[in-house]
Curated annotation (Swiss-Prot):
One of the Pfam families matching this protein, by short name: V_ATPase_I
Residues bearing the modification N-acetylmethionine: M1
Coiled coil start-end: 113-154, 297-347
Quaternary organization: V-ATPase is a heteromultimeric enzyme composed of a peripheral catalytic V1 complex (components A to H) attached to an integral membrane V0 proton pore complex (components: a, c, c', c'', d, e, f and VOA1).
Cytoplasmic side stretches: 1-450, 489-502, 601-618, 703-779, 868-890
Compartment(s) where it occurs, according to its Swiss-Prot or TrEMBL record: Endosome membrane; Golgi apparatus membrane
Superkingdom as given in the UniProt entry: Eukaryota
PTM remark: Glycosylated.
Residues bearing PTM Phosphoserine: S223, S228
Species the sequence originates in: Saccharomyces cerevisiae (strain ATCC 204508 / S288c)
GO biological process annotation, one example: Golgi lumen acidification
Assigned GO CC terms: endosome membrane; fungal-type vacuole membrane; Golgi apparatus; Golgi membrane; late endosome; proton-transporting V-type ATPase complex; vacuolar proton-transporting V-type ATPase complex; vacuolar proton-transporting V-type ATPase, V0 domain
Miscellaneous comment in the UniProt entry for this protein: Present with 1084 molecules/cell in log phase SD medium.
Protein name: V-type proton ATPase subunit a, Golgi isoform
Name of encoding gene: STV1
Length: 890
């Protein structure tokens, strides 16, 4: 199909209406999603999301999406175990890749409601089984971990008791029993508890070992009598065993020591294997605590619980308990292995179906979300939206073919509607122009049929960047980086990209042109890594004889063929010359950029057939701009082209000339050309006349036309309002006639009945005050912007100067020092060269290419968004976003 380019202006759009029977509503909607040409308008804006027709279906697929997400989490959770069972290589030895989600969504055939219901039932059953097996597996692992932990605690504590049998003895001692009764009756006040906890967490206090009492271990310096006393006094019924995190052992010991006033024996043993706690493995210690009295025993248990420790009961028959635990562990391990194998088998089946389920769920949700925008009727739904005019025939033919496959009992009505509603803006782009169009769209979407600022941006954006970045070496590095992205765009396009890299990859063609233009401007500036190139013969000749320390002057012998003469580099007045050149070049570039941008406003006015804007805005604005800044630009070129040395005259200063043109009209300090005073007065008067012209003509003309009955034309747009468009619609209607199941309504017959519902109506009553205020703001803004925007282009000179000076400083600090060694052949000098070169290259790429490049790019954005686009860009449109399954992936 021969499509309209739609680059200079947006594509022609047509408003259409579809009446779709309920029996085929899903199938037709799927077809529209695959065609990606129909921008659906919301006909139910007055309804909330819960009042729309397909809210129950959306809720259902929200639940299905949750199930698919859970299944995906379970598959990823057990990916390491199931990976070895998944087929990764086909019969030919090629890797089997996972199906791409975008391809699945675009290529999957529409499913019937019966198939969708079967798939949803299958997802529900799989989710239920996977959830049950996964929860059972986690529960079994937790129980197995508890048994292993319990066995380790019993083993370690029993071994300790066997080594110290007297500690667990049950000998009686009247004094100890009386002490136990006293402790049981002991009660602590809130102040005592606060003081005890404060002491417990004060690690500067004396430790149990410092006090000479029983701490973590039985101290070596204890006497036999003391140890015997302990063995007789501490009872087995006041023993607590358990486990706790290794990081909390010392905290537990100190808290209990302070809280029980030293009335305990505490011993801990490390557990070698990490144990599962929640979803992570942690290192733990088992402990054994001896105390006396039920009250202290309860306090110990509460402290252990507060620190998330586990208490394990230990009786005298530890060997029997260990045997019982071993049998339980073996039985539980067999059950766990069986459950795990069953789950992995289930996940293998789910793994193959997950991409299809996910694609189906996303697509069904997207379809029902779109169906909620349709207007419901008794036997069908009405859909309205915008279609590119060049796609109408394609849309009709596709609907015709599809309806024929379904049978003649179904009919879809296709109406082309006249409307004054503002159509969406649609610029056809490719992978090269897309990034440049995105630069413009980021600032604002062009109004329908407005000049596309993105077309000129393809050239002006990289060129403005290159003027500021102008270095052949740095530009070549940037060009190579972008070229690498371009040559490997298929590889990088398929991989997952982070946000930073995605921006660079998306703008790879912008970076490519930025680098190429920078190489060109680097040749113009004769600058490569802050050094000059002797490509051609210099136009200056230095004297052959001179004395050391003497200032010498070069004689001009010709004109350098291309760019700046390398003889200027390194001279005392080289910076003065380059500053003057780049400053004037910035003014010329700004004048050219703003002038052609302002010309676009004339094309916009002409396209809208708005004579009042051409006469009242464009002409006075153009005269005002050219009278001042056009004259300044001409004076710069004239001053450059005139041989002032031959005329034996000093070159006049243009800054003073421009200032005197306003402050002292007719006064000339240094004459630039004959008749200069009279011409400047005429230009100044022309600029002054343009101000009231710009201010008053449009409001007064609109007021006069309104009084005479010539105003009141609606601001809206008619999509088939011109002859060519009507002929095209007639041709499309004729081509669509004669097939069953598709009805093309007459355009004129539906225009009157539909126009009110979709159109914007006519313009309101004329308000001279509003128009006048708007024009006053426009006049002040335009006049001030002409001055400020011209000065803003001096950033081209400023950034170019900063870039050149920074590059020169970096060279002098690194490479220049590397080759200034006295012993150039020594190993130290060689190492110095290698190190300083690496340092220079890294700093060049990081600072001069990345950082300075980013700065220059942002300034180039500013020059386009503000200085250039403000001259013509309205930006009151909205983007054309067709109903497309590609939007699901994006």
């Amino acid at each position: 199909m021969n499509q309209e380019e739609a680059i200079f202006r947006s594509a022609d759009m047509t408003y259409v209406q579809l009446y779709i029977p309920l029996e085929v509503i899903r199938e037709v909607t799927f077809l529209l999603g695959k065609m990606s040409v129909f921008m659906v308008m919301d006909l139910n804006k007055d309804l909330t999301a819960f009042q729309r027709g397909y809210v129950n279906q959306l809720r259902r697929f929200d639940e299905v999406e949750r199930m698919v997400g859970f299944l995906n989490e379970v598959v990823e959770k057990h990916a390491a175990e199931t990976w070895k069972y998944i087929l990764h290589i086909d019969d030919e030895g090629n890797d089997i890749a996972q199906p791409d989600m975008a391809d699945l969504i675009n290529t999957m055939e529409p499913l019937s409601l019966e198939n969708v219901n079967d798939m949803v039932k299958e997802i529900t059953d799989c989710e239920s089984r996977a959830r049950q097996l996964d929860e059972s597996l986690d529960s079994l692992r937790s129980k197995l971990n508890d048994l292993l932990e319990q066995r380790q605690v019993i083993f370690e504590c029993s071994k300790f008791i066997e080594v110290n049998p007297g500690i667990a003895g049950r000998a009686t001692n009247p004094e100890i029993e009386q002490e136990e009764r006293d402790v049981d009756e002991f009660r602590m006040t809130p102040d005592d508890i606060s003081e005890t906890l404060s002491d417990a967490f004060s690690f500067d206090d004396e430790t149990p070992q410092d006090r000479g009492a029983l701490g973590n271990d039985l101290t070596r310096n204890q006497s036999v009598e003391d140890l015997s006393f302990l063995e007789q006094g501490y009872q087995h019924r006041y023993m607590i065993t358990g486990s706790i995190r290794r990081t909390k052992v010392d905290i537990l010991n100190r808290i209990l020591w302070r809280l029980l006033r030293g009335n305990l024996i505490f011993q801990n043993f490390p557990i070698e294997e990490p144990l599962l706690e929640g979803k992570e493995k942690v290192e733990k210690d088992c402990f054994i605590i001896f105390t006396h009295g039920e009250t202290l025993l309860k306090k110990v248990k509460r402290v252990i619980d507060s620190l998330n420790g586990k208490i394990v009961s230990l009786n005298t028959r530890s060997s029997e308990l260990v045997d019982t635990l071993n049998r339980q562990i073996d039985d539980l391990q067999r059950i766990l292995d069986t459950t795990e194998q069953t789950l992995h088998t289930e996940l293998l089946v789910i793994h193959d179906q997950l991409p299809v389920w996910s694609a189906m769920t996303k697509r069904e949700k997207y379809v029902y979300t779109t169906l909620n925008k349709f207007q419901q009727e008794s036997q069908g739904l009405i859909a309205e939206g915008w279609v590119p005019s060049t796609e109408l025939i394609h849309l009709q033919d596709s609907l015709k073919d599809y309806i024929e496959t379904l049978g003649s009992e179904y009919s879809t009505v296709f109406n082309v509607i006249l409307t004054n509603k503002l159509p969406p803006t649609y610029h056809r782009t490719n992978k090269f122009t897309q990034a440049f169009q995105s630069i413009v769209d980021a600032y604002g979407i062009a109004t329908y049929k407005e000049i596309n600022a993105g077309l000129a941006t393809v050239v002006t954006f990289p060129f403005m960047f290159a003027i500021m970045f102008g270095d052949m070496g740095h530009g070549f590095i940037l060009f190579l980086m972008a070229l690498f992205l371009v040559l490997n765009e298929r590889k990088f396009g398929a991989m997952h990209r982070d946000e930073i890299f995605d921006m660079a990859f998306t703008g790879r063609y912008v970076l490519l042109l930025m680098g190429a233009f920078s190489v060109y401007t680097g040749l113009l500036y004769n600058d490569i890594f802050s050094k000059s190139m002797t490509i051609f013969k210099s136009g200056w000749q230095w004297p052959s004889t001179f004395r050391k320390g003497e200032s010498i002057e070069a004689k001009k012998t010709g004109v350098y063929p291309f760019g700046l003469d390398f003889a200027w580099h390194g001279t005392d007045n080289g910076l003065l010359f380059s500053n003057s050149y780049k400053m004037k070049l910035s003014i010329l570039m700004g004048y050219a950029h703003m002038t052609y941008s302002f010309m676009f406003s004339y094309i916009n006015y002409r396209a809208k057939n708005s004579k009042v804007d051409i006469i009242g805005n464009f002409i006075p604005g153009l005269v005002f701009m050219q009278s001042i800044f056009g004259y300044l630009s001409w004076a710069i070129v004239y001053k450059w082209s005139k041989d002032w040395i031959k005329d034996d005259k000093p070159a006049p200063g243009l800054l003073n000339m421009l200032i005197n043109m306003f402050l002292a009209p007719g006064t000339i300090d240094d004459q630039l050309y004959s008749g200069q005073a009279k011409l400047q007065v005429v230009l100044l008067l022309a600029a002054l006349v343009c101000v009231p012209w710009l201010l008053l003509y449009k409001p007064l003309t609109l007021r006069r036309l309104n009084k005479n009955g010539g105003g009141g034309r609606p601001h809206g747009y008619q999509s088939v309002g011109n002859i060519e468009h009507e002929e095209q619609i007639a041709q499309q209607r004729h081509s669509a006639e004669g097939f069953q199941g598709m009805i093309i309504s007459d355009v004129a017959s539906v225009a009157d009945s539909i126009n009110e519902s979709v159109g914007g109506g006519e313009q309101g009553p004329f308000n001279f005050g509003d128009v006048m205020i708007h024009q006053v703001i426009h006049t002040i803004e335009f006049c001030l912007n002409c001055i400020s925007h011209t000065a803003s282009y001096l950033r081209l000179w400023a950034l170019s100067l900063a870039h050149a000076q920074l590059s020169s400083v970096l060279w002098d600090m690194t490479i220049s020092n590397a080759f200034s060694s006295k012993n150039s052949g020594s190993p130290l000098a060689v190492m110095k060269v290698v190190f300083l070169f690496a340092m220079w290259f890294v700093l060049t790429v990081c600072i001069l290419v990345f950082m300075e490049g980013t700065s220059a790019m942002l300034h180039a954005l500013r020059l386009h968004w503000v200085e250039a686009m403000s001259k013509f860009f309205e930006g009151e449109g909205y983007a054309y976003e067709p109903f497309s399954f590609r939007a699901i992936i994006e």
